[in-house]
């Protein structure tokens, strides 16, 4: 027994002496956790799953050092580590397959990672300590490179700690390519360029995330001379991007295409035939610029954007009741009627109090509670999806669980109570402030002060939310402006500079980050005037490109680089209104006067199977993904043989019926049908074929109805192109 004890003491003394002389002590937080992360041990598909695997439950990607230390050292009755025989530890034997392991081989015997884990065990398995160096930031170099296929690049990753010391952490960091067809990366940061395109290599270390961007040009950019003469900020910055990617733009769209496009994007409305013909005949070289000003000041502008923001704010009678729904809708209309500054728009919503029936913005706080308000505010006004960080460190962003609850602290003193201001049947709720209420970390119980993502602690003695709004409106903080720019870019181009448009994060970089930053600065400089942004977008030649891709732009199939306009199907509401417009009819909705267009409705609960089939959202989520753009067989059947379309085509006061009663010549009737659907005159061959079909019809009315029906079923009608 004495010999055994003596041997153990000698082993411990020797281990301590050797590590102290030759190496610093292995840190669980800074050395062990990165190894487990690189090996995939704490990933969602392995021991980082909600309930772990094989009896071992680790925190997802190693963001909870204390819990993981307990699990490894004390869990399973201490069988996972052996101080007497470190190499016999299950922590080493399973990942090297010296013991059965369902997760496969994760470590090589004798590798640096294996040696580090063995040393940590031999040194006594020192756990997380206040003496551990606190990690501060991650630097990834190079930031960006334009490469050729087959080229090899080495990523250097440096970590900086709170004591300002730094080290190369490339051997500890984790590397992942976001698109392996463009570039691959190994676990040491060695990148191999593969095929044309652009991607980022995501680098993770101790909760920090960084990226390296690599571009492999598609070819050589051509046809940029005409763009070089344009002073538009957007055009200038896309020229530079096209040069980097080796892409070339399509030609400029026709006047009719442009006119239709700005009406659908800005007003959710088709232009009428008279307007189209007048615009086409106008010889003024500034006519496109003038047309943009007109649409920005049309009353339909208010309808369109009030409806869109009603989607994002979940304006619905199901939760808000009818009075709350109308209150918020009318307030949204006033916002866009008066062209309210968008930073003030955010501020009024986030600091609202009082009766939601009397104060539209207060409805923001009727839906859900503190956590929901936090997630909605972040997603709608910052474009950041915070839901992951509620339970663990965000896996693809530098957002910790503490950041989530620091954000909730802004809303921790907001409360709601029932009110009788509108009578006992009013179901009104009053939003008010309390003097108490804190946010605490769910694991440590620590009280967290109000602090925005990436910002400083911002206290306000009266209303904590004022601190958040002050931070959002700070001219030196582009976060709010970047979100608005990216959202509206997505609405106009069919794809955000960051896509999806409400998923802004470091590992989902913009297709043109310099342009996004420049437009955000420009929006701030112009007092968050959203019409200024839309004016800049629509006046750009990039926006006015044809939706037809040429040989040079065909490589940009998803239109990530805006080499052509991305054709997009009309929304459910736009499509119903467009069908009504083309047919000369009006859909009657319950509880509102005849003449209310679909795009003018306050919520999505007005009965319409047509709009539901075409993807109208239920308004239960703030995610843009709630609106479905997917095509399906029911949509095709509805357009080809549905009762709604047949009814509208044959109505007594329809466009076709008026042609017949007014004895409009067939050639003029054909012209108007084309203008009312495709926003252009028929081409010579189309006109010839239409006249021939009408001559074969049983009567002119039936022939014109068939023509209109056929045009309503074309892609050219259904899509904004």
Predicted regions mapped to residue ranges:
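Long, His/Glu/Asp-enriched segments that create or flank divalent metal/ion-associated functional microenvironments
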Residues: 583-586, 591-592, 597-600, 604, ...
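Short sequence/structural segments immediately N-terminal
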Residues: 28-43, 127, 295-302, 338, ...
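Primarily short, surface-exposed interaction patches in extracytoplasmic proteins
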Residues: 228-300, 308, 312-590, 621, ...
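Catalytic cores of secreted or luminal carbohydrate-active enzymes
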Residues: 107-126, 634-641, 645, 649-650
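Short Gly/Pro-enriched turn/cap motifs at secondary-structure boundaries
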Residues: 79-82, 459, 627-628
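Post-cleavage N-terminal segment of exported redox proteins
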Residues: 1-27, 114, 118-152, 158, ...
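Solvent-exposed helix-loop boundary motif
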Residues: 20-114, 131-158, 163-231, 260-261, ...
């Amino acid at each position: 027994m004495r010999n055994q004890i003596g041997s153990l003491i000698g082993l411990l003394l020797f281990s301590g002496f050797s590590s102290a002389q030759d190496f610093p002590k292995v840190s669980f937080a800074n050395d062990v956790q990165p190894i487990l992360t690189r090996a995939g041990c704490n990933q969602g598909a392995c021991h980082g799953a909600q309930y772990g695997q094989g009896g071992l439950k680790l925190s997802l990607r190693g963001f909870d050092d204390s819990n993981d230390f307990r699990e490894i050292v004390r869990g399973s009755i201490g069988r996972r580590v052996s101080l007497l025989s470190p190499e016999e530890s299950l922590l080493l034997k399973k990942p090297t397959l010296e013991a059965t392991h369902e997760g496969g081989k994760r470590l090589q015997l004798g590798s640096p990672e294996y040696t580090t884990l063995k040393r940590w065990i031999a040194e006594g398995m020192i756990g997380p300590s206040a003496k551990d160096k606190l990690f501060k930031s991650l630097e990834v170099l190079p930031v960006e490179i334009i490469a050729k296929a087959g080229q090899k690049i080495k990523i250097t990753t440096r970590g900086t700690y709170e004591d300002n010391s730094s080290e190369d952490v490339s051997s500890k960091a984790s590397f992942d390519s976001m698109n392996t067809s463009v570039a691959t990366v190994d676990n040491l940061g060695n990148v191999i360029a593969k095929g044309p395109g652009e991607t980022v290599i995501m680098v993770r270390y101790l909760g920090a995330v960084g990226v390296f961007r690599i571009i492999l040009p598609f070819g050589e950019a051509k046809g940029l001379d005409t763009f070089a003469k344009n002073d538009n900020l957007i055009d200038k910055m896309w020229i530079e991007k096209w040069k980097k990617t080796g892409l070339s733009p399509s030609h400029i769209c026709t006047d009719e295409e442009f006119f239709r496009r700005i009406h659908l994007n800005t007003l959710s409305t088709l232009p009428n035939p008279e307007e189209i013909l007048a615009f086409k005949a106008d010889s003024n070289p500034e006519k496109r610029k003038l047309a943009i000003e007109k649409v920005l000041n049309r009353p339909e502008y208010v309808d369109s954007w009030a409806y869109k923001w009603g989607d994002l704010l979940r304006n619905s009678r199901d939760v808000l009741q009818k009075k709350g729904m109308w209150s918020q809708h009318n307030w949204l209309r006033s916002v866009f009627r008066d062209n309210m500054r968008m930073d003030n728009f955010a501020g009024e919503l986030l600091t609202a109090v009082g009766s939601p029936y009397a104060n539209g913005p207060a409805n923001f706080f009727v839906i859900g509670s503190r956590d929901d308000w936090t997630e909605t505010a972040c997603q709608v006004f910052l474009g950041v999806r915070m839901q992951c960080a509620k339970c663990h460190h965000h896996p693809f962003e530098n957002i910790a669980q503490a950041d989530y609850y620091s954000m909730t602290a802004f809303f921790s003193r907001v409360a709601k109570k029932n009110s009788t201001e509108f009578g006992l049947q009013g179901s009104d709720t009053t939003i008010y402030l309390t003097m108490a209420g804190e946010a605490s970390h769910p694991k440590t119980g620590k009280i967290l002060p109000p602090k925005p993502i990436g910002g400083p602690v911002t206290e306000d003695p009266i209303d904590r939310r004022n601190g958040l709004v002050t931070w959002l409106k700070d001219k030196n903080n582009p976060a709010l402006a970047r979100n608005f720019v990216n959202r509206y870019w997505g609405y106009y181009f069919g794809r955000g500079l960051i896509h999806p448009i409400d998923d802004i994060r470091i590992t989902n970089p913009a297709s043109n980050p310099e342009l996004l930053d420049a437009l955000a600065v420009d929006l701030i400089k112009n007092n968050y005037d959203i019409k200024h942004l839309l004016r800049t977008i629509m006046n750009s030649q990039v926006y006015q490109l044809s939706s037809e891709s040429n040989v040079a732009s065909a490589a940009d199939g998803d239109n990530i680089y805006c080499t052509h306009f991305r054709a997009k199907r009309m929304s459910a509401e736009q499509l119903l209104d467009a069908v009504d417009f083309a047919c000369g009819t009006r859909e009657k909705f319950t509880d509102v006067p005849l003449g209310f267009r679909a795009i003018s409705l306050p919520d999505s609960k007005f009965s319409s199977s047509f709009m539901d089939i075409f993807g109208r959202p239920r308004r239960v989520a703030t995610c843009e993904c709630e609106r479905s753009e997917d095509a399906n067989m029911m949509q095709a059947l509805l357009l080809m043989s549905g009762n709604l379309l047949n009814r509208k085509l044959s109505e007594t006061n329809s466009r076709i019926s008026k042609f017949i009663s007014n004895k409009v010549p067939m050639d003029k009737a054909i012209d108007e049908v084309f203008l009312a659907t495709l926003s252009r005159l028929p081409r010579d061959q189309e006109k010839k074929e239409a006249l021939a079909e009408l001559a074969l019809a049983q009567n002119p009315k039936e022939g014109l109805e068939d023509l209109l029906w056929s045009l309503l079923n074309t892609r050219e009608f259904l899509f904004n192109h």
